[in-house]
């Protein structure tokens, strides 16, 4: 079936709730649009204000506080807000990119860790992060466990470990000084088969939020 550019445009806008504002709870809206850019604290709030009829920021505050919506490093190796029901699959799907972006980067070298040694730290790291921790606290914890620079180790680990941003105050739930907490899922092994299965879930979710779309569209969205 042929789809005109106008039809494709309108289909995408409708799926993204951008043709008209809708009366939908904040967490449900995040799930419908698949993921919301969250590099800046205000960004998810602006995104939902543009989509929701009568948007109340307190609803998104509550969703972040309860972890119904998770802010974490994910798509395109940047911070996104995603629904809790999607987080585990998205995290696993992105593992090859998240790991490669850090473990193969020269900025990881000063940590003195191998990839396997970094992997071995994740379980204890998540236990330490069972309550919110600052960058300084995480680096201090790592300082006694790595032979090199703790800052380099944490720079890598916070990207591919299942940690989320914990609310840290301010008018948009988060401040420029992030707090990290374990996301409540098991560490994602660097298993290509598991990542491929999760990528299929991500592809279906992408089509729900943006389709019709091509493989190249999905790649631009995720990578």
Question: What residue ranges belong to the model's regions?
Answer:
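Long, low-complexity intrinsically disordered regions
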Residues: 1-223
């Amino acid at each position: 079936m042929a789809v005109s550019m106008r039809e494709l445009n309108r289909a995408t806008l409708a799926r993204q709730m951008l043709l008209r504002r809708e009366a939908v709870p904040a967490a449900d809206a995040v799930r419908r649009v698949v993921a919301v850019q969250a590099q800046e604290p205000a960004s998810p709030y602006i995104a939902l204000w543009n989509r929701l009829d009568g948007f109340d920021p307190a609803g998104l505050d509550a969703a972040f506080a309860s972890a119904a919506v998770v802010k974490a490093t994910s798509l395109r190796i940047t911070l996104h807000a995603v629904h809790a029901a999607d987080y585990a699959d998205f995290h696993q799907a992105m593992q090859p990119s998240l790991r490669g972006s850090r473990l193969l980067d020269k900025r990881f070298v000063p940590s003195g860790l191998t990839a396997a040694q970094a992997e071995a730290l994740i379980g204890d790291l998540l236990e330490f992060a069972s309550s919110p921790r600052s960058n300084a606290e995480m680096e201090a914890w790592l300082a006694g466990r790595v032979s090199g620079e703790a800052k380099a180790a944490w720079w890598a680990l916070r990207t591919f470990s299942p940690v989320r941003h914990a609310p840290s105050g301010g008018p948009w739930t988060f401040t420029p000084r992030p707090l990290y907490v374990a996301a409540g899922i098991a560490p994602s092994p660097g298993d290509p088969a598991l990542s491929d299965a999760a990528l299929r879930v991500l592809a279906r979710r992408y089509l729900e939020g943006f389709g019709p779309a091509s493989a190249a569209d999905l790649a631009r969205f995720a990578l």
